[in-house]
Amino acid sequence: ARQAVQESLVLLKNNNHLLPLYPSSNILIAGDAADNIGKQSGGWSITWQGTNNQNADFPGATSIYAGLKTQIDSAGGNAILSPTGEFTSKPDLAIVVFGEEPYAEGHGDKDNLEFERNNKRSLKILKTLKQQNIPVVSVFISGRPMWVNSELNASDAFVAAWLPGTEGQGIAD
């Protein structure tokens, strides 16, 4: 499963060769999907809609944050988790992990494929970090193609990670 995650990542943008990262850096890991195995697993995981799950409900699973932290720590870097993107010491770069809420069947029906159409909270985090001259890598979690032009334009690097399930470490690899 971890190898499948590695091989299914789609790099949509990589300005100034920001990726691969230098994990010895001070890295902020932000976004509501960074440490959320339920969100990275999608619908039909534990519960029908894949909602109201905790990381502890997935024994042996690794969140994207946990996978990144392992890589960063082993390289002598520092990983700081902040779902809202706030920090006390300016990071060298930020990885923002965001995406769709889990869904199954009709609950996932949309009349428009624009991501966060009426509430651009993820875009706000990206723009706030960019305004502070922090390079931003976006990791987008989704079970289907979505219109993310605004988020793509607000990022220095952008990775479509689809639904990595329990193997968040595959994104860090």
Model regions and ranges:
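C-terminal non-catalytic regions of proteins with extracellular/luminal or membrane-system context
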Residues: R2-D173
